[in-house]
Amino acid sequence: MPTKRNLEQIKQREFLKLVELAELAGVRYSTIKYYSELGLLPYEQRGDRLAKYYPRAEATRRLKEILKLRKQGKTLTAIISYFIKRQAT
């Protein structure tokens, strides 16, 4: 569990590692990884190991929206379609 100080430091970064985004959002590591694999979360790959780095503001905003839609009972397929349609407009 991250400390309050660690979360404050994470909130200041422009890009977050997968584990940091999970901590900040209060979701499981596997959730972030799965949503990334589905193309729901934006990220850049960097370094020799091609680690994923998430733009903090955009990724947290998108994740909140995904979680809200999931609470409303939307399937991941419906959420993917929603974002595709929204991107097209």
State where each predicted segment sits.
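Arg/Lys-rich, alpha-helical DNA-contact motif
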Residues: 1-23, 37, 42-48, 53-89
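Short coil turns linking two alpha-helices in DNA-binding domains
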Residues: 28-31
